[in-house]
């Protein structure tokens, strides 16, 4: 009898053991693929004649690739992301009943005294006749980087409010310190600045809905996708890749910060250059960094952790 009970116990134990899934080994090749990306980025940066800082942030697992990412660079027009964010935040506050906040629906009547250099859309409006909304001004600011539209929005939301919002998000090195095309302010050292790492943090908070409501987050990203001018990140990317970004250019400076929507693996990226001897080379370098990063995330988005390309799931299944 005892022998029979022992045999039954042994059989049951063996059956249970056989049903347990063996633990998978963790030393996969994904870290090697990441190291290859780091090497390629290092090579691009090393052969660039100016100074390059960059941050790449995986929006799926938070992994980051950093090079000179905590150094402060001029943002040029990339700072317009922060202006746009403040406009959206104030619109939300106004909906909640706050007084004195800018709304997306507020009307602006074009005044020619607001014109500055690189204001192609605003310059074509009829003075004291054409009326547009703050949302329209934001579209001019983002889609074609209209500087007059940007300056009007800075006046309406308040430069100090933009900076207060950035500080509230923990971004202490990202600062709006002057309006667009204010050469006197720039000569005083009042440059608009940020670090690549802080720009990716800002984009991550926007993407994850930590800076705006869900509704406004969707509207914000949709508007940032409408860029039609000088996107350096998109230089080498396939035409069908969605990108929400804002580039910037000054003499000797090229920057671009945005979210690249690689399938199943979106990432935030900010590349900033300064002391550029060859500005076209800087633009190409930003495009090369973005392409190498995209290739990595596009591959990770369609493979298992062991590197097998997985078949696509048919729609509806």
Features from the language model and the residues they span:
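Structured C-terminal helix/loop/strand segments within mature extracytoplasmic catalytic/sensor domains
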Residues: 20-44, 156-158, 201-231, 247-317
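A short, well-structured edge-of-sheet supersecondary motif
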Residues: 36-69
């Amino acid at each position: 009898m005892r022998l029979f009970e022992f045999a039954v116990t042994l059989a049951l134990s063996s059956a249970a053991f056989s049903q347990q899934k063996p633990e998978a080994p963790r030393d996969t090749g994904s870290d090697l693929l990441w190291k290859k990306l780091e090497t390629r980025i290092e090579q691009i940066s090393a052969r660039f004649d100016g100074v390059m800082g960059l941050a790449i942030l995986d929006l799926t697992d938070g992994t980051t690739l950093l090079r000179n990412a905590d150094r402060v660079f001029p943002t040029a027009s990339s700072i317009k992301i922060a202006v746009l964010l403040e406009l959206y935040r104030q619109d939300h506050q106004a909906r909640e009943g706050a007084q004195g906040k800018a709304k997306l629906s507020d009307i602006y009547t074009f005044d020619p005294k607001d014109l500055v250099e690189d204001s192609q859309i605003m310059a074509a409006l009829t003075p004291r006749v054409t009326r547009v909304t703050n949302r329209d001004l934001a579209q001019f600011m983002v889609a074609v980087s209209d500087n007059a539209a940007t300056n009007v929005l800075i006046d309406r939301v308040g430069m100090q409010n933009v900076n207060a919002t950035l500080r509230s998000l923990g971004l202490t090195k990202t600062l709006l310190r002057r309006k667009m095309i204010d050469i006197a302010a720039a000569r005083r050292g009042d440059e608009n600045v940020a670090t690549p790492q802080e720009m990716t943090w800002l984009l991550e908070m926007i993407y994850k809905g930590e800076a705006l409501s869900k509704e406004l987050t969707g509207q914000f990203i949709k508007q940032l996708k409408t860029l039609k001018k000088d996107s350096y990140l998109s230089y080498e990317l396939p035409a069908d890749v969605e990108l929400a970004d804002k580039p910037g250019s000054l003499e000797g400076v090229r920057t671009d910060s945005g979210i690249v929507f690689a399938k199943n693996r979106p990432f935030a990226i900010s590349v900033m250059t300064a002391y550029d001897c060859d500005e076209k080379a800087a633009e190409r370098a930003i495009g090369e960094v973005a392409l190498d990063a995209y290739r990595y995330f596009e591959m990770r988005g369609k493979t298992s952790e062991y590197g097998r390309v997985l078949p696509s799931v048919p729609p509806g299944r």
